Amino acid sequence: MKKFIAQMAMAALLATPVLSIAQESQPSLPYREVSAQAEDSHKVVVFFSFACPVCASYDQTFSRWAKTLPPGWSAEFLPVAVPDKGNYIAARAFFAVQDADPSRLAAFMSAAYTLIQQNGMTMEDPGTWSRAVAMADVQGFNEAWHNVTQQRLERAFAKLLTYGVDATPSMVISGKYVITPDDVSGDSALYMNLANGMISKVMQER
């Protein structure tokens, strides 16, 4: 599984005491429990990277699964906005599409994965994103791109640190439980069953 937190990210984590730092749960459990974040209590936050081949393999699965969540729940896809050029450009492009033409976001993500994972394009290359936008027929991208603020990217990075995410993909269930495919030895069907089970667990706890 792709590990992506660089030394800079870990240094930021250690130097930021105001953030809720993930606390390890029992090693035998297929999830990690962290300090609960109330704003995400009815969400599944999906952390991903376009550079991650495992994320690419889950792209369509996540998209379909997000539509099956219980009433009152939502899925939030969040790119790993680690402060390096490639990840920042990728995150900015994602947010721009999300703002400009949200109905085309899933198509944009699939196009970006294809260009990066299959065609060998890079996240640092602006041409990757202009091509993905064209493939997905996104409208209004350029204006939205200029309106994505540095603060928004920093908030995405802060959430990454809050949940102690160190692998992609990772799902955070109800702002409390973090799960990755590694927790189920990479079994994709079991991973999605685990996600459903964690949502059921949360609903029973309320």
PLM segments and residue spans:
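Sec/Tat-exported extracytoplasmic proteins
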Residues: 51, 66-69, 97-101, 112, ...
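Soluble non-cytosolic domains of exported or imported proteins
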Residues: 53-56, 84-88, 99-103, 123, ...
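Extracytoplasmic thiol/disulfide redox context detector
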Residues: 2-85, 149-151, 157, 161-162, ...
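Structural microenvironment flanking redox-active thiols in thiol-disulfide oxidoreductases
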Residues: 71-94, 105-132
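C-terminal cap of thioredoxin/glutaredoxin-like
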Residues: 135-206
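Short N-terminal signal/transit or membrane-insertion segments
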Residues: 23-32, 94-114
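Extracytoplasmic/secreted proteins, especially bacterial periplasmic and envelope-associated proteins
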Residues: 46, 57, 61-64, 88-92, ...
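Second-shell loop/turn segments in exported
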Residues: 49-51, 79-84, 98-99, 114-120, ...
